[in-house]
C-alpha cells in the first residue's frame, strides 16, 4: 500500500504518464467531458471531492508549467480565482473564453479528472512542466534564459 500521495490508482497512473506540455483538465461535476477522452471520475456527491482538494493533491505530485482558466472566472467566481492565484503562484496563467474551455481545451486534454465540485467556472487546465533544476543540474549543461525564472534564478 502507498504511504502517501494520491491513492486513486487511475489518477496516479495518469499523472505518471504525463510529459512536458501535456494538458490535464480538472473539472467540476457539470463539465461536458468528450466521449473519447481519457477520464478519471472522482465525483461521489455534490462537492465531494471538491475542486480545491483535488487540485491541492495533484499539485503535490505534478509539475505545473501553466494554468488555463476561463477568462470569466475572475468576475464570476473571485474566491476560486484568488485561491488559484495563491496556490499556483509563480506559474503562468492563460485565460480563455469559457466556451473554449468546454470545447478546444477539453479536446486538447490528455486526460480529464472530474470532481464533485459545484463551482462556477471550475474547470482548470494544468499544463505539465519539467523539473528545471534537475534537468539542468548536470555539469556542463547550460540553463536557457526562458527556463531561468522557472528555476528561481535571477
Swiss-Prot record:
Annotated InterPro entries: D-ribose_pyranase (IPR023064), RbsD-like_sf (IPR023750), RbsD_FucU (IPR007721)
An annotated GO BP: D-ribose catabolic process
Protein name (database record): D-ribose pyranase 2
Residues that bind substrate: 28, 98, 121-123
NCBIfam families on file: PRK11797.1
Pathway(s) the chain acts in: Carbohydrate metabolism; D-ribose degradation; D-ribose 5-phosphate from beta-D-ribopyranose: step 1/2
Nuclease is among the record's keywords: no
One CC-aspect GO term: cytosol
Subunit structure: Homodecamer.
SUPFAM superfamilies linked to this entry: RbsD-like
Reaction(s) catalysed by this chain's protein: beta-D-ribopyranose = beta-D-ribofuranose
Membership in a protein family: Belongs to the RbsD / FucU family. RbsD subfamily.
Keywords: Carbohydrate metabolism, Cytoplasm, Isomerase
Localization: Cytoplasm
Lineage: Bacteria, Bacillati, Actinomycetota, Rubrobacteria, Rubrobacterales
Enzyme Commission code(s) on record: 5.4.99.62
Amino acid at each position: 500500500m502507498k504511504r502517501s500521495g494520491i491513492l486513486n490508482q487511475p489518477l496516479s497512473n495518469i499523472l505518471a504518464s504525463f510529459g512536458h506540455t501535456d494538458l490535464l483538465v480538472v473539472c467540476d461535476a457539470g463539465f461536458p467531458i468528450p466521449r473519447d477522452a481519457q477520464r478519471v471520475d472522482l465525483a461521489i456527491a455534490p462537492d465531494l471531492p471538491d475542486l480545491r482538494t483535488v487540485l491541492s493533491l495533484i499539485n503535490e505530485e505534478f509539475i505545473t508549467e501553466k494554468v488555463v482558466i476561463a477568462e470569466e472566472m475572475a468576475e464570476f467566481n473571485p474566491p476560486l480565482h484568488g485561491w488559484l492565484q495563491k496556490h499556483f503562484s509563480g506559474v503562468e496563467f492563460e485565460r480563455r473564453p469559457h466556451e473554449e474551455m468546454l470545447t478546444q481545451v477539453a479536446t486538447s486534454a490528455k486526460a480529464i479528472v472530474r470532481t464533485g465540485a459545484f463551482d462556477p467556472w471550475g474547470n482548470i487546465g494544468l499544463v505539465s512542466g519539467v523539473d528545471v533544476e534537475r534537468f539542468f543540474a548536470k555539469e556542463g549543461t547550460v540553463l536557457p534564459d526562458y527556463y531561468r525564472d522557472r528555476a528561481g534564478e535571477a
